[in-house]
């Protein structure tokens, strides 16, 4: 061995494997305002201390690897490493812990949700020291939030574009989601928009299939929009799904929508990917298009309470990547969503500053530094009897989206939309008069039925409908 090698070997380097907690568990650490903070629900393997499991997550999602390496000496680990700085047991759960990890801001590329997730969740979920791992929440510091454009327009700009104020917006997903020709699809859009809706919508898997190519659908839907606008005097829209197999094709479809003069396009942000979504968001801001976001595939990631990622994290990521609407669950329909938890991430989408509130699943105070807000979209198994609860729960800055609850009306599409619009207007008027929607909702709807036969027919059809099931999977 050369003298030079002997000297290097004697200065602070010892080959081999050592416990992660010796380097990455730092309970004395005081977090910085610029740190990205993460709350992981960790289920360690039997015999693995929570400190070691939490430190392993911090290491493998930042600077660490399974063994000591020479090149550790070429940088400052104290500056760049992630730190597990606090651990607390999960109440009511054996061998589960919330491990809090702080990441220095320099670890992340500016304006890239893709890079942020690649670092924080890209490699740690298959790690042997943990039996299961779930990312419950992230604190995005203002210093990092300001590197993102965020939503193309935001809530106030959308209301100004649509000239609609003081009530939730109404939408409808065209059904059947697959199989209609472009002309029949456009006909259904027209009937719904003419009947009183603000928006109609492509479903998440409507792209460009043999039975209906995207360009044909765009043209017939644009015709429906213009005809309905001329007859109602209201601004209308249809979420034209621009999701495609390549980013170039996606932008081409969005550009065609812009040429048609329609107000809004749509993207499946999880299946399409964050890089594609951010690119489309930039295009939409530059070209005056609103951007509706569908969360297709989210339950693959967020439904299990012990493993994966909570939707509040995906919601924060969407606000950073860019979108003016996103589906958020309903609390009352066919898709899962517990009320306080749902309202927690709805606030994270809409508000500028959100206080820590563990009862609603919010682990960190979040300051968005004036980033535009996102409108939550309630959809999935909802109908006219749900209108009072939806109006009370989601408030004005929301889209209430009825698919089967519109197109399933016994008299057809237009009467179905009229029923929904009358129910909404009745609930908004009652709320503005000071009535309690939660307690008096059914009476309000029944009273409105007296002057709307369409609503009366809808109430009769769906009076017995309930979506029963076990309690929500998510727990605090």
UniProtKB/Swiss-Prot annotation:
Binds 1 Mg(2+) ion per subunit. The active site is at 175 (proton acceptor), 294 (proton acceptor). The modification N-acetylproline is found at residue 3. It catalyses: 2 (2R)-3-phosphoglycerate + 2 H(+) = D-ribulose 1,5-bisphosphate + CO2 + H2O; D-ribulose 1,5-bisphosphate + O2 = 2-phosphoglycolate + (2R)-3-phosphoglycerate + 2 H(+). Transmembrane segments: none annotated. PANTHER family: RIBULOSE BISPHOSPHATE CARBOXYLASE, RIBULOSE BISPHOSPHATE CARBOXYLASE LARGE CHAIN. NCBIfam families: PRK04208.1. RuBisCO catalyzes two reactions: the carboxylation of D-ribulose 1,5-bisphosphate, the primary event in carbon dioxide fixation, as well as the oxidative fragmentation of the pentose substrate in the photorespiration process. Both reactions occur simultaneously and in competition at the same active site. This is Ribulose bisphosphate carboxylase large chain. The gene is rbcL.
């Amino acid at each position: 061995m050369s003298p030079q090698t002997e000297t290097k070997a004697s200065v602070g380097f010892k080959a081999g494997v050592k416990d992660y907690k010796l380097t990455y568990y730092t309970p004395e650490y005081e977090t910085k305002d610029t740190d990205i903070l993460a709350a992981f629900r960790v289920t360690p393997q039997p015999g693995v201390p929570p400190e070691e499991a939490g430190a392993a997550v911090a290491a493998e999602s930042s600077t660490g690897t399974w063994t000591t390496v020479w090149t550790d000496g070429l940088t400052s680990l104290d500056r760049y490493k992630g730190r597990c700085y606090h651990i607390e047991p999960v109440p009511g759960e054996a061998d589960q812990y919330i491990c809090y990890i702080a990441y220095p801001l320099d670890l992340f590329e500016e304006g890239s949700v893709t890079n942020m997730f690649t670092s924080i969740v890209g490699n740690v979920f298959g790690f042997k020291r943990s039996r299961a791992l779930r990312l419950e929440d992230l604190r995005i510091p203002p210093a990092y939030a300001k590197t993102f454009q965020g939503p193309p327009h935001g809530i106030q700009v959308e209301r100004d574009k649509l000239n609609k104020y003081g009530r939730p917006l109404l939408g409808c997903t065209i059904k059947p989601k697959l199989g209609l020709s472009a002309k029949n699809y456009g006909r259904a859009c027209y009937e719904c928009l003419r009947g009183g809706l603000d928006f109609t919508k492509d479903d998440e898997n409507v792209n460009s299939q043999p039975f209906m190519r995207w360009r044909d659908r765009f043209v017939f839907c644009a015709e429906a929009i213009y005809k309905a606008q001329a007859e109602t005097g209201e601004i209308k829209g249809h979420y034209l799904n621009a999701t495609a197999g390549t980013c170039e094709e996606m932008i081409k479809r969005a550009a065609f929508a812009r040429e048609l003069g329609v107000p809004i396009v749509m993207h499946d942000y999880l299946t399409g990917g964050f890089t594609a979504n951010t690119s489309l968001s930039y295009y939409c801001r530059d070209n005056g298009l609103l951007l509706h976001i569908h969360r297709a595939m989210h339950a693959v990631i967020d439904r299990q309470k012990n493993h994966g990622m909570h939707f509040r994290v995906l919601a924060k990521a969407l606000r950073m990547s860019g979108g003016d609407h996103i589906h958020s669950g309903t609390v009352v329909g066919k898709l899962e969503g517990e009320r306080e938890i749902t309202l927690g991430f709805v606030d994270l989408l809409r508000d500028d500053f959100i206080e820590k509130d563990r009862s609603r699943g919010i682990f960190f105070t979040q300051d968005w530094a004036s980033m535009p807000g996102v409108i939550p979209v309630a959809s999935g198994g909802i109908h006219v009897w749900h209108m009072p609860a939806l109006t009370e729960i989601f408030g004005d800055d929301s889209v209430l989206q009825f698919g089967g609850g519109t197109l399933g009306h016994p008299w057809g599409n237009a009467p179905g939309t009229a029923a929904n619009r009358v129910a909404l207007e009745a609930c908004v008027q009652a709320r503005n008069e000071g009535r309690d929607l939660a307690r008096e909702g059914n009476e309000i709807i029944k009273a409105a039925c007296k002057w709307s036969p369409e609503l009366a027919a809808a109430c009769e059809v769906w009076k017995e409908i309930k979506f029963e099931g076990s309690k929500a999977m998510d727990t605090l």
